[in-house]
Amino acid sequence: MIPYFLLSILGLIVVYSTTSATLIEEGKSAFQLVRNQGIFWIASLILIALIYKLKLGFLRNGRLIFIVMIVEMVLLALARLVGTPVNGAYGWISVGPVTIQPAEYLKIIIIWYLAHRFSKQQDEIAVYDFQVLTQNQWLPRAFNDWRFVLLVLIGSLGIFPDLGNATILVLVALIMYTVSGIAYRWFSTILALLAGSSMLVLSVIRFVGVEKFSQIPVFGYVAKRFSAFFNPFNDLAGAGHQLANSYYAMVNGGWFGLGLGNSIEKRGYLPEAHTDFVFSIVIEEFGFVGASMILALLFFLILRIILVGIRAKDPFNSMVAIGVGGMILVQVFVNIGGISGLIPSTGVTFPFLSQGGNSLLVLSVAIAFVLNIDASEKRAKLIREYEGQTSVTL
């Protein structure tokens, strides 16, 4: 919990630093967004306390998972039909002063869903080969999960479009399949298909041209991201403006940064400085040394979560914990890849540091599940040791 508290408090500081100047210029309170973030953090702490005390056996109920996923699908549909567009993408539902982003919650639901399915079918997954899987009735029972995940991902990308969360969902699902005990040849086949598909899409976009690709109604928003990725300096006043200023922010920071609150780029130059590109401002203010220390703390948290999964004896617990660790790890790499130009910018927030109550709630709930799993596994270990000692005595 210590890394979680440190990162959450640091997140509040960063949110204030990246938003206060702009809010003051707009005639608003400098504490408006950090206050909202603080409210979500308090709600997150309450959820963590409640989830930690629960017995998580009910999570293995297939009917409950089905109901939750139906509710999620309804929320996703509502987000597209009546949601508020942000930067060309739909995915937010406004309920009074609160804004709900259903796609954020889909990440933890996918982990829960796949952990439940594969924890019940590990033996079958490990022994079936490609030929049997394509002919046997077992396929719809387990690998229908993969089809369902793909359907959700394609729908998310095509309907909103939400390239960032779609990318995270693909990679998290891949991690879940990896830890499920799937045969290596199946894993390598899926990985090769994903890599090949990604290269094909990039090649087609490059060959056809971003301008023509952007004329497709569904992919206009995505095309702008790819345009900036290929060469942000070709359109500094348009699609490349955000990425180019991200570069400037990181260069300004140098080794030790300009100091907390002294960022230049956050003062109207770098759009979304408090969300997608918050880590660029972190580098500008704390420098590469300070940013590296923050990453080290975050990776320490991820490692602890993954170790809980590795040590867990229960397959369901193991896959949930590793899935949560993988989710945070993927989100970090996708965000840093986007702000540094290694991959197209996808609108993914940086864990704990970006302003966004939905993201913080999802991270907190996920960590609460891991804390509960860790405690239950330790209790189970003590029971096994006690029973072992009792049997030896008898």
Which role fits each region the language model picked out?
Residues 41-44, 105-115, 169-173, 296-299, ...:
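Alpha-helical transmembrane segments of multi-pass membrane proteins
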Residues 1, 7, 13-160, 336, ...:
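Membrane-helix boundary/helix-loop-helix interface segments in multi-pass membrane proteins
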Residues 39-47, 285-305:
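Hydrophobic alpha-helical transmembrane segments
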Residues 64-67, 147-155, 163-214:
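Hydrophobic alpha-helical segments of polytopic membrane proteins
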Residues 167-186, 264-287, 347-361:
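Interfacial segments of multi-pass membrane proteins
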Residues 86, 191-288:
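Hydrophobic, glycine- and aromatic-enriched re-entrant/interface helices and adjoining loop segments
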